[in-house]
Structure formats: structure tokens, C-alpha cells
Amino acid sequence: MRESLTYETGLREECGVFGMFDLEGGDVARDMYYGLSALQHRGQESCGIAVCDTNGPKGVVNCYKGLGLVNEVFHEETLKRLGGNLGVGHVRYSTTGSSTIENTQPLVLKYFKGTLCLAHNGNLVNAFEMRRQLEETGAIFQTTMEIGRASCR
């Protein structure tokens, strides 16, 4: 007996992630905006940019995010306020978790070693089990995304 192969048809996307570092210390926010615009076909629910100045105060991260398209969320004055030479950006196409501002990435996490910015474009296969186990040990989650679960490890 011969097995038949089934192929998915149609567009199937996941989130888009864009990172940038300017060695000369220049502001990356505007270029991040253009990078996310180019990736926007991968996610149109929400977007965000987190930047820091590697020559400035340690642990200071400026983050701006919102629901909607890149050009709806970011405006000239917002990009100017972000300021920094290191950044990560994200456009979201949700496969798990609801489309809320809490689930918009990048996530900015503060922990005992400093500040961490996190963005991803995939799914964890054991996300629900991982969350249950972590909650049993006292972990508290602010989002319904899998990335929050992974960041607690």
C-alpha cells in the first residue's frame, strides 16, 4: 500500500525578528523600523522595538510596542525617543496566545543579572506542560505566550 503525501497550500507565516548593532554608536531605531517594515508580511497583529545604548547606563532599555502595522505603531517622535545603538524588533503573527499588548514582543525582562530583551518566531512543543511545572514551583506569568515560559528557566 502506498502512502499519499499531503502538502499544505496557501501562505503560512510565523513572526519576524530583526536585530541590529551599530559599532559606531549610531541610533538604530529608524533602521529597525525599516527592517520590521520589510518583515511585516510575516506578522501584522503587533510590533515592537527595544533598544539600549551600549555606551550609556547599564541595564537601561527603551521599548515601544503596540497593536497594528509597523507604520501605525511607530511615528517619527517615537523613533527619536527610543535612541540606542543596539536593538531587537519583532512583528507578530500569533500561533499561540491571544493578540494583546501583553503578548507583543520584544519582552523586556528584569532579573538579578540585569535586563534581557527577548523575541522569537517559533513554538515550543511542550509549552503547556512547561508552564504547569513552573507554576507549581511558584512562577508567575504575565503573558499567554510560550516565550514567557521559556524565560523562567
Regions found by a protein language model. Give the residues of each.
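Conserved short alpha-helical segments that host acidic/polar catalytic motifs at enzyme active sites
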Residues: M1-R153
